[in-house]
Amino acid sequence: MSTAKLVKSAPSELLYTRNDLDDSVKTSTIALLNQLVVDFIDLSLITKQAHWNMRGANFIAVHEMLDGFRTSIIDHQDTIAERVVQIGGVALGTVQIVGKQTSLKSYPTTIHSVQDHLKALAERYAIVANNVRQAIGKTEDEASADILTAASRDLDQFLWFIESNIE
């Protein structure tokens, strides 16, 4: 099959799929999901940055907790990115795109205490959790909403755990 048959003609730029969602639903859902792919990639990297660089009371408990969070975030990120492709989009997750489009403030690299990291993480986890909840309400694709609902449950739990460790 030629490439021309795989790509619909402009302006929609959707890849061919037999998925019968309306093209406008696909396009709007792809935009929502790709923003979340960016945010999840950034959140996973921020989580690892904190994991590597914290010191102080409760270090090992928080250090290990963050490893589990990151694994789950990466799993959700993968599911969201794959949904983009399933409905005819291109998942956008390069470091250049993440750097330009993330919803998150730059993570401070000059903090070291567990408490400072927890506060910085709580702020960023809340942003992503809230963005996911908003996207659930905006998408007209039930399968995407279901994927986001699962991610929302985990992010809310992670935020709760982080906030519960802040003194």
UniProtKB/Swiss-Prot annotation:
Binding site for Fe cation: 51, 78, 82
Cellular component terms per the entry's GO annotation: cytoplasm
GO process annotations (BP): chromosome condensation; intracellular iron ion homeostasis
SUPFAM superfamilies membership: Ferritin-like (SSF47240)
Gene of this entry: dps
HAMAP family tied to this protein: Dps
One protein family per Pfam: Ferritin
Keywords per UniProt: Cytoplasm, DNA condensation, DNA-binding, Iron, Iron storage, Metal-binding, Oxidoreductase
Quaternary assembly: Homododecamer. The 12 subunits form a hollow sphere into which the mineral iron core of up to 500 Fe(3+) can be deposited.
Reactions catalysed according to its record: 2 Fe(2+) + H2O2 + 2 H(+) = 2 Fe(3+) + 2 H2O
Covalent S-S links between cysteines: none
EC category: oxidoreductase
Listed name of the protein: DNA protection during starvation protein
Molecular function via GO: DNA binding; ferric iron binding; oxidoreductase activity, acting on metal ions
Annotated family: Belongs to the Dps family.
Compartments, record wording: Cytoplasm
